[in-house]
């Protein structure tokens, strides 16, 4: 449990004794080794410079770096555990000029009620600009009783997939 606050002990007991089914997901990627982070060599005086920090991650921050460059990780972005199991089935993907809508069904295949996060990613085609392998476009958390299913829709704007450079290159 990370940054759980002053009630961390009470929350941990409820998770461990099964009175609460956890559903949180990691908001960052956890590398296997600190040196696996691209900025590790130049951050926090690791390069002998405590006055200036130079980030060279560019657009490849967090999961975008690890996914794009195929780095193995200890725990990926969005990782989380539960006392139940879920299956997510993509029902449809609809797109027009302005938006993309993904419809899915989340089925709780376990024996405990629980919550699951459905994540939608997109991959942009290659072009002149650097792009991560994939980017999170949207997500939604749904509560599903054991043995039941829940429909979910996630919509995002097509503009969210655009790239813009400072040398006036724009790619849809």
Regions found by a protein language model. Give the residues of each.
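Short acidic, gly/pro-rich beta-turn/loop elements at beta-sheet edges
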Residues: 73, 114-116, 130, 162-164
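Residue-level detector of conserved catalytic or cofactor/ligand-binding positions
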Residues: 165-172
């Amino acid at each position: 449990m990370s940054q759980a606050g002053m009630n961390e002990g009470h929350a941990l007991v409820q998770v461990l004794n099964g009175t609460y089914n956890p559903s949180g997901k990691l908001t960052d990627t956890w590398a296997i080794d600190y040196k696996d982070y691209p900025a590790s060599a130049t951050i926090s005086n690791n390069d002998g410079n405590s006055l200036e920090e130079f980030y060279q991650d560019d657009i490849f921050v967090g999961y975008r770096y690890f996914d794009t460059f195929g780095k193995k990780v200890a725990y990926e972005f969005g990782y989380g555990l539960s006392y139940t199991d879920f299956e997510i089935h993509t029902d449809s993907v609809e797109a027009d000029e302005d938006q993309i809508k993904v419809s899915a069904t989340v089925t709780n295949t376990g024996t405990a009620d629980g919550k699951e996060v459905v994540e939608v990613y997109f991959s942009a085609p290659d072009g002149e600009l650097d792009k991560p392998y994939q980017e999170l476009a949207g997500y939604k958390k749904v509560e599903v009783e054991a043995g039941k299913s829940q429909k979910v829709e996630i919509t995002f704007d097509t503009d969210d997939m655009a790239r813009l450079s400072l040398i006036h290159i724009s790619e849809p």
